[in-house]
Amino acid sequence: MSVQSNKNLSESAQVDQQSIQPFPRSQKIYVQGSRPDIRVPMREISLDVTPTDFGGEINAPVTVYDTSGPYTDPNVTIDVRKGLADVRSAWIEDRGDTEKLPGLTSEFGQRRLNDAELSAMRFAHVRNPRRAKAEHNVSQMHYAKKGIITPEMEYVAIRENMKLAEAREAGLLVEQHAGQSFGAAIPKEITPEFVRSEVARGRAIIPANINHTELEPMIIGRNFLVKINGNIGNSALGSSIEEEVAKLTWGIRWGSDTVMDLSTGKHIHETREWIIRNSPVPIGTVPIYQALEKVNGVAEDLTWELFRDTLIEQAEQGVDYFTIHAGVLLRYVPLTAKRVTGIVSRGGSIMAKWCLAHHKENFLYTHFEEICEIMKAYDVSFSLGDGLRPGSIADANDAAQFGELETLGELTKIAWKHDVQCMIEGPGHVPMHMIKENMDKQLECCDEAPFYTLGPLTTDIAPGYDHITSGIGAAMIGWFGCAMLCYVTPKEHLGLPNKDDVKTGIITYKIAAHAADLAKGHPGAQIRDNALSKARFEFRWEDQFNLGLDPDTARAFHDETLPKESAKVAHFCSMCGPKFCSMKITQEVREYAAEHGLTDEQKAIEAGFAEQSSRFKDGGSVIYKQV
């Protein structure tokens, strides 16, 4: 998306062309649900036929999870000025428990809407918001507890399965390791009823604000695929609305399951409207950031009334989950005094400063039940913030961190009492041997509510490479039971990420999440690995590229040393060359076995050795021969 900053965005905004290019040899497919408007998108990767040297068999296409929304569907016309097509309005209206409001009800929202100076940057198609009718609760958890399977629940069940039954029939899952799930209850098939039961139990959430009707529903929970979040957002130092929308579309192209808008600069309200209207994935925010902007950055001036208005403002726009730092209690703040890095969470430091300035308990904690009333009126999910997370491995697993975690467990039970969906945020910076303690304690304190962690980073010595230091920890905690991993880019601790950094962070975390799914033994997780390994063994280079998480980079790396098209059908790569390719040698052993009627590869190798030995002896046992 490229726009001159002095133009009217509602007239000039353009989609980022890189974000709408279909992936090579891929097509968008839609799996039909029980009603015509349940159409679940997936990406299907077509594969080449196995070369005749290896049997010439047809390889079935591989279906993969797709977060890119309509952006990679060539049959859909994208216009970011109008936003994405509606997905959920009919489902919401059919339930009959919501009402359309005559306009925005938050004071700040009304003020921004009536400010003529903002018209050039305002999203042109602002809709009247929807809210629960009086005495009604519209959360997915509320429906689940009543035994209702919503279209959203059916949608995510279809999405999680990724045509698993068809893949099994096609022979794509001949091999899959059992995995170690550490007590998770992962079924062989995800059904709508299983989704309902997990949401009712609080072990999973479907973040789906009733005002975000463009959303393609997804689920976060330890018994489902591990998800990843990508952060975007402007700051006082730079970035514009159009750049943030471009980051959104770029991030979901590469696999971001949710996106958090962490904007702290100007025009937060307008930026968020553009992002939500163009997002097929859940959008999360940290409302205290905007509340702080409203009091010119003076934390002491924050009030419950101002924060409440901010929650309503964002809920009416369609934010799907709020990070709320309600566990930063006055009594925990002194516990951070001897830390190496103190309080590193922005939200945590804001609330700690407010508590100390007023010598009062955190107003997010004291007004928590009132917050729940707002959340259930719009179906906004809690992401209970870890404001006292460790910012260095020296501070990992200390009294402040775990004290807050225990409080988050108490708040989780209050949220569940109101049938409000809830996940828990976690660290941070934790060395490898201390990671499992974090997961175990979270499961214990928060009764298996989904865990959502930033990494964790496993060492502090690699600025510029913290996507790697954190990717290690993310893979581990995902295996242990973490439901969603917040990505870290190479710019962590150094600056705002650009598009390349966003892609690098997402790919790193897709690797971590997938590695965790494999280790847990998630059904079907190994399909893509098996298909790529088979393509690698059969020297189907294009299939290797296209089955990868990043086909562009894989192809570019291959072409650096073997750029000719003929190299893409060669039976070797540049690492070993044609004479020393282990896979080529293995194939020759198999061919020898077939020619000589041997069914055991080891016997074939031994027979080959014996044959060569006889030739050596028949030649006079001479080491060197005159030629």
Swiss-Prot record:
InterPro entries: ThiC, ThiC-associated_dom, ThiC/Bza_core_dom, ThiC/BzaA/B. Zn(2+) binds at H429, H493. [4Fe-4S] cluster binds at C573, C576, C581. It catalyses: 5-amino-1-(5-phospho-beta-D-ribosyl)imidazole + S-adenosyl-L-methionine = 4-amino-2-methyl-5-(phosphooxymethyl)pyrimidine + CO + 5'-deoxyadenosine + formate + L-methionine + 3 H(+). It comes from the Bacteria. Residues 1-21 are annotated as: Disordered. Binds 1 [4Fe-4S] cluster per subunit. The cluster is coordinated with 3 cysteines and an exchangeable S-adenosyl-L-methionine. Belongs to the ThiC family. PANTHER family: PHOSPHOMETHYLPYRIMIDINE SYNTHASE, CHLOROPLASTIC, THIAMINE BIOSYNTHESIS PROTEIN THIC. Catalyzes the synthesis of the hydroxymethylpyrimidine phosphate (HMP-P) moiety of thiamine from aminoimidazole ribotide (AIR) in a radical S-adenosyl-L-methionine (SAM)-dependent reaction. Homodimer. This is Phosphomethylpyrimidine synthase. The lineage of its organism: Bacteria, Pseudomonadati, Pseudomonadota, Gammaproteobacteria, Pseudomonadales.
